[in-house]
Amino acid sequence: PVAPGDVDYILLTHAHIDHSGNIPLLVKKGFSGEIITTFATADLCDIMLRDSAHIQMFEAEWRNRKGRREGKPEFIPAYTMEDAMGVLRNFVRCPYDKIIKPAEGIEVRFVDAGHLLGSSSIEIWLTEDDKKEKIVFSGDIGNLNQPLIKDPVYIKEADYVVMESTY
C-alpha cells in the first residue's frame, strides 16, 4: 500500500462518488497534493462530496442514537462536511484537450469520455531516459449519440490501458 501522504497527484476522471468519494478520506489521512480534473468535474465534486459527507454524518448520527441503547461503540463517519469542503482547495481545473505537465517527465491530457458532464479519459505520457510511454485511463465511457452529452473521444494508441469495466 501507498501512504496517502506519499502521493503527489490525483487524476480524477469524473465526479461520481464511486470515483471521487474517497478523496476527503485520503486528505484526512495525509494526502496534500493536487487533484487534477476538468472544470465541470471539480464543480460537480463540490456538490457531490458535500452531499456524501452529509449522508455519512446523518448515518453516523442515526447509528449512534441506536447504538447507545445497545451499548455499541461510537460510529464515526469516514469524513465530515468540513473534510469535504477542505478538499476543494486541492482541485486544479484543467480544460479538455490541453496537455499539462504536472511534473518533470509527466504530461497529461483529459479528453471527453461522454459519460456525464465533465467526464474524461486520461492520457498520460511518461518520459524517462529518452523513452516515452503512454498510459490511458479510460474512466467510465459513455454512449454515442446521446442528446445532452458529447460522444466519447476515441484514443487510438497507448502502450498501456487501464480500462473501466463495470458493465
Per-range role (PLM):
Residues 1-11, 20, 27-167:
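His/Asp/Glu-rich metal-coordinating catalytic cores
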